[in-house]
Amino acid sequence: MNNKSISPIILMILDGWGHSTNAKGNAIHEANTPIIDKLWDNYPKTLLSASGEHVGLPHKQMGNSEVGHTTIGAGRIINQDLVKISKSIKNKEFFNNYQLHNIYKYSCEKNSKVHIVGLCSNGGVHSHINHLKALIQISKQYKVMTCLHLITDGRDTLPKQAKLFVKEIIDIIDENYNTEICTISGRYYSMDRDCRWSRTEKAYKAMVENSCNQNSSSDILSIIDKYYEQNISDEFLPPTKISMHNIVHNDSLIFFNFRPDRIRQLLHSFAKPNFKGFQRKTIKNLMLTTFTEYDSTLSIPTVFPNEPKKNFLGQIISNSGLKQLRLAETEKYAHVTYFFNGGIEEPFPGENRELIASPKVETYDLPPEMSAYQLTNSLIEAINKQLYQFIVINYANPDMIGHTGNMNATIEAIEIVDQCIEKVLHTIEDTNNILIITSDHGNADYMLTDENKPCTSHSINPVPFILINNRQKKQTNLHSHGSLADIAPTILDILNINIPNEMNGKSLIT
């Protein structure tokens, strides 16, 4: 393929930028965005479904960054882990899973405890409470001491909903004398993914030591109430010990999150050789398993092994002899690389990656710009070098600031991204570069509930798709009623590369 004859494509993913005509709680509607408004009015555009069955999730289940980027890269609808695991519970295959029974048998033989760790909510983004309930059923069968280490959500759910989910678990374990809730911890601590090891360490110590944040009360609901009285929401609950059952030699440990990126640091604190995050305890003969593969470099058995995926967009670009660049800040780096490539860690031949560090702050509403300006400068530099035929860039701002629930900061973040788009447009103005602007899911478009309470979770609204090709501005029409699965076939169509049979998405170009 003659690379010089190709019009380079820039795929710009505005993370968390949904489309809604409802102005209430809509930071995108409230923001001053003259650039993207002009593009929407003057270039071919359509709306894409980014939630539910359109991205391999249950009906009306909100999309998320992992699923969104996987679907964009796949060019097909893939049944996501949430669906696969829930289906296995429904058809009872879950209760015959070899790896789970292996874990429980090990603890029976060693007369030790089984520890279950994961996000306790019905958010469905990283985990699901029904999967935890199914594990507790297996615990009843084996009658081994089972310790629950519950991570509270408040991000993919309402900010103060943890008591509802914990109560559901209490109702189950009241019938099961050998199961106890041993720790709680907000996901801010247990699910950091930006190497803020001081947060992970606090969660780790609650699980392995008696010295961490003990409570005189063993009533977990009262403990949560006390935190609420201090205006501490679920996401930020300090790691707290409820029962004195530590993780010790010969114990077993099950991680039930199915999405790996935010639980990986906590896993590493137990399992990674030559771990350097903080000083950890020596725990011998610890048997580990994870619901899905969290880290391919660790030989940890999984309950639901990865299914082989081939002919993702990045692989096809590479096989066609084209060069590509993936560009994101820390918070979304895994999404434009690992997830976009179908769970493959290593870059494809001809694929370069650039990571811009996210700011080290408590919450991202403190600097709504995050690293958007640095990202934009790197993108402009890459465009000017004329090395790449395909560039993927992710702007994290709408999603990450949207998750804070801070409306004013989110509006500012949206306006900053709009300014960055303007700089990119000036750069490609007199070139043959093609810019595609889209998103992976909604968030900043829905920040207030019907009860006027802050909403920090994603929305199920569609996302925009704008095709900016100055050489064919008036000649291109786009299909309506598309989905994220149609983006990769559209890009291959523009590049005049055959769309593989594995891609069941369709080109959006009519």
UniProtKB/Swiss-Prot annotation:
The keyword Plastid applies. This is 2,3-bisphosphoglycerate-independent phosphoglycerate mutase. Pathway: Carbohydrate degradation; glycolysis; pyruvate from D-glyceraldehyde 3-phosphate: step 3/5. GO terms for biological process: glucose catabolic process; glycolytic process. Belongs to the BPG-independent phosphoglycerate mutase family. HAMAP family: GpmI (MF_01038). Catalyzes the interconversion of 2-phosphoglycerate and 3-phosphoglycerate. It is an enzyme of class 5 (isomerase). Its main location: plastid. NCBIfam families: pgm_bpd_ind (TIGR01307). It is found in: Plastid, Chloroplast. Its EC number is 5.4.2.12. Mn(2+) 2 binds at residues 15, 65, 440-441. It comes from Antithamnion sp. (Red alga). Mn(2+) 1 binds at residues 399, 403, 458. It holds the Pfam family iPGM_N. The active site is at residue 65. Its cofactor is Mn(2+).
